Amino acid sequence: MRVADFSFALPDNLIARYPQAQRSACRLLSLDGQTGALAHQVFTDLLEELAPGDLLVFNNTRVIPARLFGRKVSGGKIEVLVERVLDDKRVLAHVRASKAPKPGSALLLGDDDSIAATMVARHDALFELRFDDARDVLTLLNDAGHMPLPPYIDRPDDVADRELYQTVYGERPGSVAAPTAGLHFDEPLLAALRAKGVEMAFVTLHVGAGTFQPVRVDQIEHHQMHSEYAEVPQEVVDAVLACKARGNRVVAVGTTAVRSLESAAAAGEQALTPFFGDTSIFIYTGYQFRVVDVLITNFHLPESTLIMLVSAFAGYRHTLAAYREAVAQAYRFFSYGDAMFITRNPAAAAERG
């Protein structure tokens, strides 16, 4: 299929720049993957959609304040977006500058240029930086970094984003973008779901900046997916297998949970096996899902790998029809926007656009 097949018109005013005042107050567009039927709901209607014994799988990563501004000692402004923390002193980062720093270049980062760093080496598009600071990397970023809001939010980050651009259950720092489907869950909703008997499990996938990179090929099969670190521990495997055995559904909260679970399924000969490592799994039309039965997700960018994943799950025609309806009904799009509840379309893998 062509990347252009996943384009759709989106008025600028439907891009959410700020979240709802209450996390769980967003709208929810439910899509029956098998029939294409749509229902307009609110997010707390999950209580009716989910049955006792269903398993919600969350991504418990936390967003780090990964953006730093500064300058090269030799002159010239610089912007650093940390992609991956290597150890207490080193990171891999995207660097924006009029002229890329060379190995050995000294940098002064932070709003007051107080953080000394050195460009150690270049690894393809990423720069290895070493911080010459008494603090470890995560403490340093927490003290001086900016929240890495997506480009389409198109405003500077503010103090409130440090809380709002995090899930309430995130506990593993390492992402440069939020697993946004999880932003809609607040403590009262989680408590109500537990009281109903809905099971919960947590994977980890540290979202990289590659999630915002455009697909630069014409045919989606030619796209090279970025790599991200994921963990699916044994207790998640056990919870998934128990859920399947009792005839309930595995409900992935977000595309990152999908990619984690399906990576674990692809890694072993069994249906699912523990997984700890990098994944570059690219899910698009034709993919045979092995684990996930239901997907909760936000509305994604045109021509993005994320809308391709949704299309592989619900079916291309059903997905594009749902997006057209969402635009017509003025749903809010992208990270701070509204959500979808999608049941898997077993016929989706046979579609070809």
Swiss-Prot record:
SUPFAM superfamilies: QueA-like
GO cellular component assignments: cytoplasm
Catalytic reactions of this protein: 7-aminomethyl-7-carbaguanosine(34) in tRNA + S-adenosyl-L-methionine = epoxyqueuosine(34) in tRNA + adenine + L-methionine + 2 H(+)
GO terms classed as biological process: queuosine biosynthetic process; tRNA wobble guanine modification
Chaperone in keyword set: no
Keywords, in A-Z order: Cytoplasm, Queuosine biosynthesis, S-adenosyl-L-methionine, Transferase
Protein purpose: Transfers and isomerizes the ribose moiety from AdoMet to the 7-aminomethyl group of 7-deazaguanine (preQ1-tRNA) to give epoxyqueuosine (oQ-tRNA).
Family designation: Belongs to the QueA family.
Annotated protein name in UniProt: S-adenosylmethionine:tRNA ribosyltransferase-isomerase
Lineage of source species: Bacteria, Pseudomonadati, Pseudomonadota, Gammaproteobacteria, Enterobacterales
Name of the encoding gene: queA
